[in-house]
UniProtKB/Swiss-Prot annotation:
Broad class of enzyme this protein falls into: lyase
Protein name according to UniProt: Cyclic pyranopterin monophosphate synthase
Positions of substrate binding: L76, C77, H78, M114, E115
Protein family according to the UniProt entry: Belongs to the MoaC family.
BP terms from Gene Ontology: Mo-molybdopterin cofactor biosynthetic process
One of the record's GO molecular function terms: cyclic pyranopterin monophosphate synthase activity
Organism the protein comes from: Brucella abortus (strain 2308)
Top-level taxon of the source organism: Bacteria
Amino acid sequence: MSGKLTHIDQTGAANMVDVGSKDETERQAVAEGAVRMKPETLALILEGNAAKGDVIGTARLAGIMAAKRTSDLIPLCHPLMLTKVAVEIEPDENLPGLRVRALARLKGRTGVEMEALTAASVTCLTIYDMAKAVDRHMEIGSIRVIEKSGGKSGDWAVSDPALMR
């Protein structure tokens, strides 16, 4: 890993990285996050009784849509032709809450970590939005990249994927 910030030039100004000379490779990133909530809120969501409708289905779609809009949201991110975005939402009664895992993939010249992080973040935000009427104490946390593959820096994965214990 380089000790240099790639989006800052020698004068300290922010710039978009020129990826034109990079080789196209298969690239993938997986990010995760979680929404901690009251057990009764989790039960309400799992039973499909939230006032705003299907929380899990809506949050999943929101995450996928957000990944495709990452370059509109994060300055200096390249617009990417994603080949796959997938979002999984799993209940965890021990949390209690919902765990989110988002995958982004492409064949291109730059990584997809920001797209995976955006998908995970917006999925969690949507869960919060759809359930906040019954639980204002929900907590969103531990949003992070847990694995990436492809590109010059190669493959990487966290050694302990558990979060929000």
